[in-house]
């Protein structure tokens, strides 16, 4: 779209940033405003131009203004589906009713006597005309945005727009674009114009790749949970484990409110803010964090949720449930018991060695036999919740026909009936992502941190993402043109795997891929990397867990 002078790129400069760009990855770098808008805008234009070409191939307008369509074209199927969806008359002009647009949908053979072109009805033509105009209008809006982008400006620049832009639109370019992308995602464009994305072929390679991706996400989620527990403990925060159930008479209300869980956690955050004497309109991210995983009971088929609340300050009215009791068996926190409006909740104080409750003077609880609960590590609660993460991941894979676990078809059907927005893990923004600052580290060390293995630190994926984020900040003042020039050639992993299968066979594929993705061990890394991991408190030696934690108690 933009022309750049051939002398613009400085090869030494491009060569210097190539390894940084490759390590950070375009998915991270495109979080920068200017680069993000540039990439998204070009992607949207490409899609809309494809759709426009689709709508203009296989149709002809004659000198009288009548529209004629080739019934064998791909466009014929699109127009037929649109007419059926909108309830338009499916008949063609000047052609017997023995063949209509509905017949194209059902795949009925076109009569041999049919002409090469069939005349569309006025109703269908009007819908077609308005559709094409709509595509052109969407394209023009994208061209307007693209015309305001400066490829030679830095990737972190937020484009505002010139005087011409201000005459056309009310908001600055970047705000206008963010709103457009949010209100009009690409999937909606495809759906509205009946231009479905081609479905990929499901074979052994695609299954291996999808299963590997899901397992990787599961592992990353568990790492975030465990790191959040570590951080909360180091800051002296309170940890509360909660189970949220759904009452029969509240099921409809829960499913009718897509923000039920979001509102619940927001209310808890506001309770913490109030306890700290702050406005409920403040952000609670610095004093409250949460993690929530759904569970679908395989025995009774009931959806419920397990949540971990991390609080700097307990809500007002939070009292030791065992104060003044002869037998200290209670662990539920009274101030949180009536906050879940869709059923029953059981907020339990998580007790472990050197917890915040002990420092606040809460009595140590006992079990049903009157014996003091065994003191465990703060990380043990993370392991306990992690099993629910693993269980949900197993269900997700089973629904997709992946994994080794056997699940009955009835369960798969029931899971598919639950809205995806409900049956997903949710957590606070940047939950468990905080690590020691990397601003002082060399670029070489940052690149090394993206490759360390689990034996260096069990938080290696979090380490990787933080290092990439730091690299992004160091590339922030590079131009869009520089970054695009420095980006590596991308490889279609699925295509690569399929080609590889022909050489080594499907049975050896997983082991071969594993050998290609080896991580750096403690003997491979530099002293600066070792020192950072140790200083951050995330070395393997710092995080040994010997005992297990259970969520029992009342």
Swiss-Prot record:
InterPro entries: Replication_gene_A-like (IPR008766)
Protein name, as recorded: A protein
Gene that produces this protein: A
Its biological purpose: The A protein is a specific endonuclease that cleaves the viral strand of supertwisted, closed circular DNA at a unique site in the A gene. The A protein also causes relaxation of supertwisted DNA and forms a complex with viral DNA that has a discontinuity in gene A of the viral strand.
GO biological process, one term: DNA replication
Active-site annotation: 384 (o-(5'-phospho-dna)-tyrosine intermediate), 388 (o-(5'-phospho-dna)-tyrosine intermediate)
Protein keywords: DNA replication, DNA-binding, Endonuclease, Hydrolase, Metal-binding, Nuclease, Viral DNA replication, Zinc, Zinc-finger
Pfam families: Phage_GPA
Species: Escherichia phage G4
Annotated zinc fingers (unnamed), start-end: 287-309
GO molecular function, one term: endonuclease activity
């Amino acid at each position: 779209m933009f022309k750049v002078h051939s002398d613009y790129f400085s090869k030494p400069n491009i060569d210097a940033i190539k390894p940084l760009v490759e390590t950070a990855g375009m998915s991270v770098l495109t979080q920068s405003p200017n680069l993000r808008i540039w990439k998204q805008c070009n992607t949207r234009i490409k899609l809309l131009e494809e759709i426009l070409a689709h709508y203009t191939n296989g149709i002809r307008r004659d000198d009288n203004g009548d529209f004629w369509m080739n019934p064998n074209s791909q466009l014929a199927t699109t127009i037929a589906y649109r007419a059926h969806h909108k309830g338009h008359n499916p008949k063609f002009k000047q052609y017997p009713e023995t063949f209509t647009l509905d017949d194209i949908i059902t795949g009925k053979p076109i009569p041999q006597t049919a002409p090469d072109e069939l005349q569309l009805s006025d109703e269908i033509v009007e819908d077609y005309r308005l559709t094409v105009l709509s595509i052109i209008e969407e394209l023009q809006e994208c061209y307007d945005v693209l015309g305001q982008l400066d490829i030679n400006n830095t990737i972190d620049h937020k484009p505002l727009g010139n005087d011409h832009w201000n005459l056309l639109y009310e908001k600055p370019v970047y705000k206008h674009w963010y709103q457009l992308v949010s209100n009009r995602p690409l999937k909606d464009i495809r759906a509205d114009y009946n231009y479905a994305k081609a479905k990929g072929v499901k074979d052994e390679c695609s299954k291996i790749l999808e299963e590997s991706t899901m397992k990787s996400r599961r592992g990353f989620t568990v790492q975030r949970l465990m790191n959040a527990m570590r951080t909360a403990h180091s800051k002296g925060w309170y940890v509360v484990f909660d189970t949220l159930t759904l009452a029969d008479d509240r099921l409809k209300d829960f499913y009718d409110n897509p923000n039920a869980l979001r509102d619940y956690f927001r209310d808890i955050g506001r309770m913490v803010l109030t306890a700290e004497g702050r406005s409920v309109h403040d952000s609670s991210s610095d004093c409250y964090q949460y993690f929530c995983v759904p569970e679908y009971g395989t025995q009774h088929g009931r959806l419920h949720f397990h949540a971990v609340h991390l609080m700097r300050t307990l809500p007002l009215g939070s009292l030791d449930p065992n104060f003044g009791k002869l037998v200290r068996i209670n662990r539920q926190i009274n101030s949180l018991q009536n906050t879940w409006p869709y059923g029953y909740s059981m907020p339990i104080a998580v007790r472990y060695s050197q917890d915040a409750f002990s420092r606040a003077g809460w009595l140590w609880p006992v079990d049903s036999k009157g014996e003091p609960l065994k003191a465990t590590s703060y990380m043990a609660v993370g392991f306990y919740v992690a099993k629910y993460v693993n269980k949900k991941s197993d269900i997700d894979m089973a629904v997709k026909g992946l994994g080794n676990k056997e699940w009955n078809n009835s369960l798969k059907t029931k899971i598919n009936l639950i809205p995806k927005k409900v049956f997903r893990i949710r957590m606070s923004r940047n939950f468990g992502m905080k690590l020691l600052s990397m601003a002082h580290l060399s670029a070489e060390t940052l690149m090394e941190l993206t490759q360390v293995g689990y034996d260096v630190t069990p938080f290696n994926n979090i380490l990787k993402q933080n290092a990439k984020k730091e690299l992004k900040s160091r590339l922030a003042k590079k131009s869009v043109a520089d970054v695009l020039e420095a980006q590596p050639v991308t490889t279609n992993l699925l295509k690569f795997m399929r080609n590889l299968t022909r050489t080594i066979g499907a049975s050896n594929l997983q082991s071969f891929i594993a050998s290609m993705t080896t991580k750096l061990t403690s003997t491979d890394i530099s002293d600066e990397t070792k020192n950072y991991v140790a200083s951050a408190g995330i070395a393997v030696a710092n995080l040994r867990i010997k005992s297990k934690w259970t969520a029992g108690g009342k």
